[in-house]
Amino acid sequence: MEERNIELDIRRWLDLSKSGKAKEAKDFYYENLFDTVIERFEKNNQQVISGSSVDVLISILGFSPEPIVLGAKLLKPKTHIIIHDAGVSLNEENNRIIGKYLTDYHFVELQDETFSCLYDTLKEQLSIHPAQHCVINITGGKKSMSASAGIFARDFFCDLIYVDYSKYDPSTRRPEPGSEFLNLVYSPYRDLPELFHK
């Protein structure tokens, strides 16, 4: 029954999106689809990151709050830090959706988007919140931010994740709801070049 209903809801969401009713489509998504998307994501991705619980999750926030919520709901970190640039902090939808679905997180605003600023901010956050198991979610970040975070993850023994998708609708420029999955981009336990890539 749930599968049939989500398929009907996806069609309804697509119809609203394609007919130019962007606000109605967005409202419909959050009212009728996102809870199911979260449930599926948690159910289908429990084994992606194995080992100890996540002490610190650092998420890079872009213009869509969904990857931040999905990553945090799945990983259930002890501490969740959401890093964003100045432009993103003005996005009311981000604040509303993150506040609705998550309860324990800290926002940190970047002074600028340079490599050194993001790298130093990540380093500062790990000194404030020491962690044995740190995960960085790069889904929302710009490419330059993702590159900085990737280098930082390598230097500081952090997992690097990306909320990806298997189905994409080009007309809405969004993933099909329910097709999201967790991509473990880098893991120091799996990917250290000197150990595993000879």
Predicted regions located by residue number:
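Long, low-complexity, Lys/Arg-enriched
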Residues: 1-134, 144-198
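Short glycine-rich or small-residue beta-strand-to-loop segments that form or flank ligand, phosphate
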Residues: 135-139
